[in-house]
């Protein structure tokens, strides 16, 4: 008897564990998110963002042999008790130009849940819940719909999103 795996979905998550004295300046990232949201402009390039992006691409590439290039990046601010609409970072009619992976990074978050929807063959409508914490990332296939819930009632949640193409 033989077995062949035809498809598999991998989710990657954990803390961003930067080398000593190279910590991500989350105050700078949250300021950049605030500025881009208020001014309705693209997220600005910064050394801090580049450190995060380089860390993610290098570590996923080295540990899991998943080589990535950037597609887009933006930041979101979620109000207390806010639940997003279901989010999907692909264009179903243009999959060729859609990203392969979505990364969520907790810039400044408190009691933030992420629900990722997936299908397991004929078992449709499955979901997986994970708490997004400060300095934590969650990366998953962009074909998965997801939403975020800000469960607390006293502060904003800042989340950085980066989409990648698999090469």
How should each PLM-predicted stretch be described?
Residues 161-167:
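Double-stranded beta-helix
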């Amino acid at each position: 008897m033989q077995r062949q795996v035809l498809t598999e979905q991998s989710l990657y998550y954990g803390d961003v564990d930067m080398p000593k004295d190279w910590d991500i300046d989350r105050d700078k990232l949250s300021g950049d998110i605030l500025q881009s949201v208020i001014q309705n402009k693209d997220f600005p390039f910064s050394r801090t963002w580049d450190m995060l992006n380089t860390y993610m691409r290098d570590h996923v590439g080295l540990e899991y042999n998943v080589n990535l290039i950037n597609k887009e990046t933006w930041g979101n601010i979620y109000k207390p008790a806010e639940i997003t609409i279901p989010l999907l970072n692909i264009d179903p009619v243009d999959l060729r130009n859609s990203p392969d992976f979505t990364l969520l990074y907790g810039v400044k978050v408190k009691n933030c849940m992420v629900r990722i929807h997936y299908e397991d063959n004929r078992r449709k409508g499955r979901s997986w819940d994970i708490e997004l914490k400060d300095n934590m990332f969650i990366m998953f296939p962009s074909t998965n719909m997801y939403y975020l819930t800000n469960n607390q009632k006293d502060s904003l949640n800042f989340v950085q999103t980066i989409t990648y193409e698999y090469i």
